Amino acid sequence: MSQQETTLPLVEGFDAFYRREYSRMVALAYALLGSGVAAEDVVQEAFLAAHRRWSKIAGYDDPRGWVRRVVVNRATSVLRRRTAEWRAVHRLGSRDAWSTVPALEPGAREVWDEVRALPRRQAQAIALYYVDDLSLDEIGGVLGCSPGTVKTHLHRARQQLERKLASWNEEAG
């Protein structure tokens, strides 16, 4: 069997995997980052890394889980960089210019802004649960913690969001 014959199924497998998972991964990254451009960059980097290692990753029980983990890790890196840049810009007395116009229903951007304002693990747990529809066990695998810890993150995040959303209703009503 030639090299081309052995790699062709792997390439076709990656292409199908990419087409099937790309949108879902972008939604997850967007939930974590709040920017469509940044989300697409992170997801493209994750899929590029997966493509380079596809002969190995294709044999994993959960290739999607591998890509998801890379997306979450890279999104976390972007957020750390943004925080450092934000601090530097504010030390200089300048205004930041990080605004994007996402295609969301009215009010959704504000809700996700509040999610991103949560502690990092809580925001990640919320995004993985509500955007990527993962179980507590799966989220624990992505975040490297137990399902019980995931439950705690989700509970605390929901409490904070409930308080914030209740204050919105009081202000509006």
Task: Report residues per predicted region.
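Helix-turn-helix DNA-binding module
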Residues: 116, 120, 132-149, 159-163
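Arg/Lys-rich amphipathic alpha helix in sigma70-family domain 2
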Residues: 55-59, 69-91, 104, 167
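C-terminal edge and immediately downstream basic/flexible tail or linker adjoining helix-turn-helix-like DNA-binding
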Residues: 1-8, 13, 87-89, 99, ...
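A short, charge-rich alpha-helical start-of-domain segment used by transcription regulators
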Residues: 2-27, 37, 51
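A short pre-motif secondary-structure segment
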Residues: 125-129
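Structural recognition of an alpha-helix C-terminal capping motif at a helix-to-coil junction
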Residues: 41-48, 61-73
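Internal acidic/polar
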Residues: 77, 85-115, 135
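Sigma70-family region 2
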Residues: 6-7, 45-62, 81-83, 164
